[in-house]
Amino acid sequence: MSASKYKNLLKPLDLGFTTLKNRLIMGSMHTGIEEFGVLKGGHNQRGGLAPLARYFEERAKGGVGLIVTGGIAPNREGKVSPWAGKMSNKLESRAHRDITEAVHRHDSKIVMQILHAGRYGYHFWNVAPSPIKAPI
């Protein structure tokens, strides 16, 4: 990669409401770590959100300016599976603070991808325009 060809890649980007330290963006990907099931205190048998916080912190340490999380459902009906992550109350919101703080320690930003699974949801309470499950 020629430095002159991508001369702005490592320069800050002012978005008006915040500034990214560079223009490197980690796109959303589903890792399976999102499936945490926040319980009392934001922890469960799999360690709550600590593994996800460590995962994103390593990417922030690597220098990425903006991280987009994997899909998090806005409610129970929008989950991909019964154990998938969601954020629809204060407990779940507080549980995500560790992730945000871990990323911010390295001057990176993070944005949550909100994902309503619709007919791709595989559980008995999902809501979609069609009762037919997606074939994938």
What is each model feature region?
Residues 2-28, 103:
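N-terminal amphipathic alpha-helix/helix-capping segment at the start of soluble metabolic enzymes
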Residues 66-92, 114-127:
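Glycine-rich, proline-tolerant flexible connector loops at the mouths of alpha/beta enzymes
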Residues 50-75:
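Catalytic domains of carbohydrate-active enzymes, especially glycoside hydrolases
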Residues 26, 59, 63, 103, ...:
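Conserved, mostly hydrophobic/aromatic
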Residues 21-22, 64-65, 107-109:
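Loop/turn elements at helix/coil->beta-strand transitions in domains of secreted/extracellular proteins
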Residues 35-58, 85-105, 124:
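Glycine-rich anion/phosphate-binding loops
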Residues 15-16, 23-46:
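N-terminal binding-site loop/beta-alpha segment at the start of enzyme catalytic domains
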Residues 101-104, 109, 115-136:
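Non-globular sequence segments
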